[in-house]
């Protein structure tokens, strides 16, 4: 793909399989796409076609039964990310430069945890120098989403927020 330099995200030949009863079951067989900066991309397909597997692969949250067989992912200005589980770049990218919105957002949030806890769980693997620095990122993210009172939102439970 020669468009990757102007892309926000470039995925090349991503192959993912699941292991079930000691058998390898391919789910993604060489998916490739480019998402240009400022554009929106939607993955459409029937149930079981690999949409969620693709998204989970990109943010590194596949279940233990899944394996990324091969592929490359480039973020932003052509930064190469080895999509193996051991790549340290995942920690600096996941949750900060890429994320996933679940089909049913109500199921994605634990109702007994505050929004602050959800943020902290997402950011816990990031190299923050202090808890205050991590909190600043939480506040900044909420301000980007046009929340006027980030402190109130962080202390709220999912059911206390509307929309």
How should these model regions be labeled?
Residues 133-152:
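Conserved ABC ATPase "signature" region
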Residues 44-46:
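The feature captures the beta-strand-to-loop junction immediately N-terminal to the Walker
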Residues 155-161:
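Conserved ABC ATPase signature
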Residues 67-81:
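Conserved ABC transporter NBD signature motif
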Residues 80-99, 125:
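ABC ATPase NBD coupling module
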Residues 9, 28-30:
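Conserved structural motif at the start of ABC-family nucleotide-binding domains
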Residues 104, 111-125, 137:
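Q-loop/switch helix immediately C-terminal to the Walker
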Residues 1-21:
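ABC-family P-loop ATPase nucleotide-binding domain
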């Amino acid at each position: 793909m020669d468009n990757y330099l102007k892309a926000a995200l470039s995925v090349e030949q991503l192959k993912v399989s699941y292991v079930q009863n000691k058998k390898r079951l391919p789910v993604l067989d060489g998916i490739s796409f480019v998402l240009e900066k400022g554009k929106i991309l939607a993955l459409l397909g029937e149930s079981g076609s690999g949409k969620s597997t693709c998204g989970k692969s990109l943010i590194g949250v596949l279940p233990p039964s899944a394996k990324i067989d091969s592929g490359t992912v480039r973020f932003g200005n052509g930064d190469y990310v080895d999509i193996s589980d051991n790549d340290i770049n995942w920690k600096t990218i996941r949750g900060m430069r890429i994320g996933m919105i679940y089909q049913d957002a109500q199921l994605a949030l634990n109702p007994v945890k505050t929004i602050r806890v959800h943020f902290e769980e997402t950011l816990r693997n990031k190299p923050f120098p202090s808890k205050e620095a991590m909190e600043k990122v939480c506040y900044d993210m909420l301000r980007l989403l046009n929340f006027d009172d980030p402190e109130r939102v962080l202390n709220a439970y999912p059911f206390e927020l509307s929309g």
